[in-house]
Amino acid sequence: MAHGSTAHEVLAVVFQVREASEPVTKGRHRAKPQPNVLLWQRAKEPQRGAWSLPGGRLRNDEDMTTSVRRQLAEKVDLKELAHLEQLAVFSDPNRVPGTRMIASTFLGLVPSPASPELPPDTRWHPVNCLPPMAFDHGQMVDNARARLIAKLSYTNIGFALAPREFALSTLRDIYGAALGYQVDATNLQRVLARRGVITATGTIAQSGRSGGRPAALYRFTDAALRVTDEFAALRPPGLPG
């Protein structure tokens, strides 16, 4: 199809590790952390009502980062992100009908347990159970998830998913959810401490209803992205490191 003009849009793939209820036994459930992506329903044709990534057209007077932050604030009322970075460009001439639209995608992260107030047409969706999505937005989510998994290996990007202070069990659950496999808390603490990524706060968590020994609390040493080991790769248990 021939295109007489070209437009540019910015789209945000925003992840947060959120707790979901899963059945354990009849009548009993437990909270299971899992990665979610923020989606909103398109308000206009084509594919009006379809679930899609938040974003929109790039204005002539703004750069892409400014634009994506504006779109998130205006359209889904999301103003605070712990991390935002540009990902990839999707430029297939026929990716959307009508005017050719080039899309620049961004990865955004919201820490747990933040709970932004969302408009009625916007919702968190588990990445392993996504609804049918508009255009090529499903591919964009897959691309962003792969980038996040890779960066968890060689950077300190976990800071953007975790609370300010956390027990190692909480961090284990967040990393496990984001990576897609179980993570050992002791091994994770050893790796991240060796890289200077986390440090003990010297305080302990409040005891839960079940009692027991209170857990020591940790925090990330930085609240900005940095490479910690450019050749590192976290792998599922049983695979060679």
Regions from the PLM with identified roles:
Residues 200-241:
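Long, intrinsically disordered, low-complexity Ser/Thr/Pro-rich regulatory/activation regions
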Residues 105-108, 116-152, 163-170, 174, ...:
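NUDIX/MutT-family hydrolases
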Residues 8-10, 32-36, 65-117, 129, ...:
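Active-site segment of metal-dependent pyrophosphate-handling enzymes
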Residues 1-51:
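N-terminal strand-loop-strand
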Residues 53-61, 160-161:
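Short histidine-centered catalytic/ligand-binding loop motif
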